[in-house]
Amino acid sequence: MEEILIILRIYLILYSINLKQMIPEIRIEEYNYDLPDGRIAKYPLPERDSSKLLCFRNGRTETYRFTDMPSLLPEDSMIIFNDTKVVPARLHFQRKSGAHIEIFCLEPVDPEEYVMMFAVTGSCRWKCIVGNVKRWKNDTLNLYNPFDDETIAAMNLKADLIERTAETSVVEFTWCDSIPFSRVLEICGSVPIPPYLNRDTEEIDLERYQTLYARYRGSVAAPTAGLHFTENVLEAIRNKGICIDTVCLHVGAGTFLPVKSSLVSEHTMHREPFVVTADFLRRLIAHQGKLVAVGTTSVRTLESLYYIGVNCIEKGYPHDVGQWDPYIRSYGYSLTEALNAIISYMDAKGLDQLQAGTRIIIVPGYDFKIVDVLVTNFHQPQSTLLLLISAFLKGEWKQVYDYALGNDFRFLSYGDSSILFRE
C-alpha cells in the first residue's frame, strides 16, 4: 500500500510539472493600457442603440453607429445571445451593534439549482461575498430598513453565517414562509452594478443593466455586450435572414476581478454554470455559415461545448470544463463529433437541456473551435476578458484599443460596442 502511495505522489508531481510546461506563460503586465476615469461610461446613453460601434475586419478599424450592426453581419451567419437575467443579488443587513454588513449572493448552495432556488420559500443557503465580514460575530442579522418600509419589514428577512472562508462565505437566509426567494430579492435586494462605476445603484440601472431579451434569472453581472440591442436592431437582423439563437451562462462576480498575479497561469477562474438545449446543438451542427457571438460570456459558453463533447466521448458524461483543459493536450475530434457526443448523451438520459459548468480561460494561443465574429464592449486593463480579445484578434488588441481611445469611444459596461472579425 505504501509503495502505491509513493508511486501516486510521483505521478502527481510529474503531472504537475508537465501541466506547468503546457500552460501558456503570459505576463499580465503586457495587457495593460492607460484608461482614464473620464473614459469609463458611468451611465448608459439615453437610447440603447445610439452607442458608437468599432468595426475591426481584415486589419482595418472603422467607426459606425450601433444601428449599423445588422448591415455588418455576414448574410450566412448565425448570431448567439446569452439570455441570462441579472438578479438583485446585493443585500444590506445590520447587526444589533449598528454595524452594516453587505451580502452579495454569488451562487446557490441549497437548493443548488437556480430554478428551485428562486421558487423556494422560508429559507435557503447561498455562497456569498460578505463585506465587513470580520465584524460579523456569528449573530443573526436583520435586513437594513432605514425608512421602515412596511413591505420590506413584512419579509422578516434574516441572515446567519454558516461557513466562512478566505474569499466567500455560506449564508443562510430565512424569511416568511409564503414568499418565493425571487420575490424577496426583488423587494429587498439591489442590482449589483460594477464597482468601477463608483456609484450606488440607481433607478435607471433596474432597466438598463439588463438586456431586452434577458430570460433566465441567475447572473450577478450583465452580459453587457447585449445591452445595446433594441427591438429595431433585432428586427433588422431577422429581416436580413440571419438566424438568432441563445445560450444561457449565469455570469459570476469573477467578471469584476482583475488578474492580480503577475503570471496568468497563477490566476484562478471561477466556475460559471450554463445551459444549452439539444435542439440548439442540432441547429449549431447544421449551420454552415459564420458564427457570431454576442459577448465574451457567449464565447466562453460556445467554446466550452467542444470540451464538454470531448468529455462525453472519453469519460461518458459532460464533466465541467477546467480552466486549462484546452491547453494541456491536443484533441483529435472534430467539432461535429464533439457536439454529436453531447446530443447522444442527452438522448440516452432523456434530457432536453444540458446543465454544465465552465472555468475555461481563453488566452493568446487558444485555438477557436466555433466563434468567427465577436460583438463586445471595451474591457478593463489586465483582465481575463482583454486576454480573450487578444486571443481572438491574434495579438492585435492594442491597435483596436488605441483606435478606441483616440476616437472618443466610451469604455466598460455602459460604454460603446465593437464588432471584431477573426481572420
Where are these regions (language model features)?
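Surface-exposed, charge/polar-rich loops and edge strands
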Residues: 22-423
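Short, positively charged and aromatic/hydrophobic N-terminal segments
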Residues: 7-9, 13-18
